[in-house]
From Swiss-Prot:
Record text on subunit structure and interactions: Part of cGMP kinase signaling complex at least composed of ACTA2/alpha-actin, CNN1/calponin H1, PLN/phospholamban, PRKG1 and ITPR1.
Annotated positions of the Phosphothreonine modification: 170, 180, 184, 259
Name of this chain's protein: Calponin-1
Pfam family, any one: CH
Calponin-like repeats: 164-189, 204-229, 243-268
Organism lineage: Eukaryota, Metazoa, Chordata, Craniata, Vertebrata
Keywords, sorted A to Z: Actin-binding, Calmodulin-binding, Phosphoprotein, Repeat
GO terms, molecular function: actin filament binding; calmodulin binding
Record-stated family: Belongs to the calponin family.
Superkingdom classification of source: Eukaryota
Known role: Thin filament-associated protein that is implicated in the regulation and modulation of smooth muscle contraction. It is capable of binding to actin, calmodulin and tropomyosin. The interaction of calponin with actin inhibits the actomyosin Mg-ATPase activity.
């Protein structure tokens, strides 16, 4: 089986755009540093094309065996595609056990099908950093920070609960200490006076306003009768004969004597109209001189 079976065709559209962006992130200077490191450890020449020299997985397996002996038990030197893929898979498993994080490791197709050489380079750099952390002399990558584990006694852990963290703010400066619910009466007093308890109920706090100036003292509900009198007269309460201002006036025109609208009303003048006399028993009922009413209906 030829290797052409595993090669992909040219990419178009979005796939080509993604492939170009990944290719732009490839660092050729890092490639030269990795080449010198791998060739120095394994003693084998990679070739002019760096990725093609690693494609069969033979150099990679020998390289991890140098860093960690016994990592790959068998290295396939066959030219068959599945043997080369098997070498790459064994290398990936070996560097995972060596300590490289899974998110830093490339996939087999990234190298074998030339789909993402940038990820392959990132994996080799992560392997160099892990080797430097374990004490190998490597000029590539960075050394990982060592874990600084601390063990605390249970008493120390319980004491930490009394500490206010920075995320909870501070207990200095202005605070809401002593604040009550909205609308609740609050007593204001001077602590310099030495009074531990608030003042009595006769004290008006600042939140309740002031007892000076205009106020609503003596005000009643709207529409309620209010007695108006002069305090100089010595009368605490006015009698019922006084008409308050809220009740109007008893002078001028009024509706006194008015009847319901539409009822007949008898109008007569007592100077000209005699007092009506009602007949006694036995007298005739018709007496035109005794009744002088005019119906104004």
């Amino acid at each position: 089986m030829s290797s052409a079976h595993f090669n992909r065709g040219p990419a178009y559209g979005l796939s080509a755009e993604v492939k170009n962006k990944l290719a732009q992130k490839y660092d050729h200077q890092r490639e030269q540093e990795l080449r010198e490191w791998i060739e120095g450890v394994t003693g084998r020449r990679i070739g002019s094309n760096f990725m093609d020299g690693l494609k069969d997985g033979i150099i990679l397996c020998e390289f991890i065996n140098k860093l960690q002996p016994g990592s790959v038990k068998k290295v396939n030197e066959s030219t068959q595609n599945w043997h080369q893929l098997e070498n790459i898979g064994n290398f990936i498993k070996a560097i995972t056990k060596y300590g490289v994080k899974p998110h830093d490791i490339f996939e087999a197709n990234d190298l074998f099908e030339n789909t993402n050489h940038t990820q392959v380079q990132s994996t080799l750099l992560a392997l160099a950093s892990m080797a430097k952390t374990k004490g190998n002399k490597v000029n590539v990558g960075v050394k990982y920070a060592e874990k600084q584990e601390r063990k605390f006694e249970p008493e120390k852990l319980r004491e930490g609960r009394n500490i206010i963290g920075l995320q909870m703010g501070t207990n200095k400066f202005a605070s809401q200490q002593g604040m009550t619910a909205y609308g609740t009466r609050r007593h204001l007093y001077d602590p310099k006076l030495g009074t531990d308890q608030p003042l009595d109920q006769a004290t008006i706090s600042l939140q309740m306003g002031t007892n000076k100036g205009a106020s609503q003292a003596g005000m009643t509900a709207p529409g309620t009768k209010r007695q108006i009198f002069e305090p100089g007269l010595g009368m605490e309460h006015c009698d019922t004969l006084n008409v308050s201002l809220q009740m109007g006036s008893n002078k001028g025109a009024s509706q006194r004597g008015m009847t319901v609208y539409g009822l007949p009303r008898q109008v007569y003048d007592p100077k000209y109209c005699l007092t009506p006399e009602y007949p006694e028993l036995g007298e005739p009922t018709h007496n035109h001189h005794a009744h002088n009413y005019y119906n104004s209906a």
